[in-house]
Amino acid sequence: MIAMPLHRALLKNFLGYAPDWYKLTIFGFLLINPLLFYFVSPFWAGWLLVVEFIFTLGMALKCYPLQPGGLLALQAILIGMTSPQQVWHEVTGNIEVLMLLVFMVAGIYFMKQLLLFVFTKLLLRIHSKPLLSLAFCMAAAFLSAFLDALTVIAVIISVAIGFYGIYHRFASQQGEDEADISDDSALNGEEHHRTLDQFRAFLRSLMMHAGVGTALGGVMTMVGEPQNLIIAKSAGWDFVDFFLRMSPVTVPVFICGILTCVLVERFKLFGYGVNLPDNVRRVLEDYDRDMTEKRTQQDKVRLLVQAVIGVWLIIALAFHLAEVGLIGLSVIIMATTFCGVTEEHAIGKAFQDAMPFTALLTVFFAIVAVIIDQQLFSPIIHYVLQSSDSAQLTQFYLFNGLLSSISDNVFVGSVYINEARNAFESGKISLPQFELLAVAINTGTNLPSVATPNGQAAFLFLLTSSLAPLIRLSYGRMVIMALPYTIVMTLVGLLCVEFTLVPFTDFLMNNHWISLPNLTISGSHA
């Protein structure tokens, strides 16, 4: 066996299974950045770094962004674009967000049985496809307003994979141990192939409705998305304040999103409108009946306990009884205690999904530190702040929407709220205008970002899941199926920012439903 040359072995190990062109591109970035920083302009080197980082987010299907983005961030610190102290300042300033990801996501993991039970009953009890789609969309929206969207999508993916596997094993006449549900060669007859294709289309539409539902619900509350918490902290809002502040935009968008769900199903547009095949329903109902009969008293108690913990979670968040991460920790403690999960390795599994994204979010903050130190967004913010107050809202919404549709909305939201806070602290905008800009930034990062899987973490999670190849859900198909929602949510959001945000906020203020927070000019910001 001929030994592999050292340089070839290094390239092979570098970024693992990412394609060679991608590896060489990252190498090129790492080579160009210090040259541009030292010999041309720190400002333009900083902007190139931001573009490079957005590129790594956009190429998330080629390689998880933590490694290439982390290398770029490390190099930026080493060559002096920012300092470890500034990065640490950003991280500590956003510790609530990191706590949310670590503890809340893990906490909801221990409530999966209840969520699986709910979505299973929805799928089997509701026979009308438009009504079922509406139920999935609204259930995902409600859950995402209080829980982590990734966890909600993960649960629905689990339901879909489970049901797909049940029918696939039935159609291929294989046992649970021997079946490979990704292999269709064992299917018996053309009818089973046709039925399975129809079932795939049915599951695709349900998953997309649920994914959009997480965006519709997630934009409404401060815990719905990680960037919401960053924005809420910067603006000085609690849970109820955040909901009321967003409502002039989010409530009309929610209503129009729900109408879109019904219309695309009713008129069978953009790949929607496919019904659950009758023979698949019979197989799934038989399986559910069998599982219900096997459910023990202990299993029933676990479901009841998880439902009670869910009520505690909603009350604790609504009344801000503690920081979000601590509420998540309380969920972990209660759910594991009363559901009998006491082994360390079993508890450890709950943290697996959140930790990579938590690490990536810390890298985001390093890039934000570069943006602050190099004042990269100052020209853009200066340009926007030359406009009238209403034009500022529209421009912030559109700038956020455009970037969020191609990049990660947590990163975009963090950057823009930071710049808006800086403008307020330097006296360029008033406190009421800053509060309105925070609404425009939050809705801008959350609503148009459904356009592509790059923008919404839940969409990216769905696309990279083991379910996507089973139901033939590709990147292009996701973009097409998201298109009606993208158009409606973006345009309705824009119109609301333009016409309803200011008068309705004034109405809430005059009736003492909301008030201006006591923000200190010298306070730390997100």
From Swiss-Prot:
It is a multi-pass membrane protein. It is found in: Cell inner membrane. InterPro entries: Na+/H+_antiporter_NhaB. Belongs to the NhaB Na(+)/H(+) (TC 2.A.34) antiporter family. One of its GO terms (cellular component) is plasma membrane. Keywords: Antiport, Cell inner membrane, Cell membrane, Ion transport, Membrane, Sodium, Sodium transport, Transmembrane, Transmembrane helix, Transport. Pfam families: NhaB. The chain crosses the membrane at residues 14-34, 35-55, 99-119, 122-142, 146-166, 206-226, 239-259, 307-327, 328-348, 357-377, 397-417, 451-471, 479-499. Na(+)/H(+) antiporter that extrudes sodium in exchange for external protons. It catalyses: 2 Na(+)(in) + 3 H(+)(out) = 2 Na(+)(out) + 3 H(+)(in). One of its GO terms (molecular function) is sodium:proton antiporter activity. This is Na(+)/H(+) antiporter NhaB. Its main location: membrane. It comes from the Bacteria. The lineage of its organism: Bacteria, Pseudomonadati, Pseudomonadota, Gammaproteobacteria, Enterobacterales. The gene is nhaB.
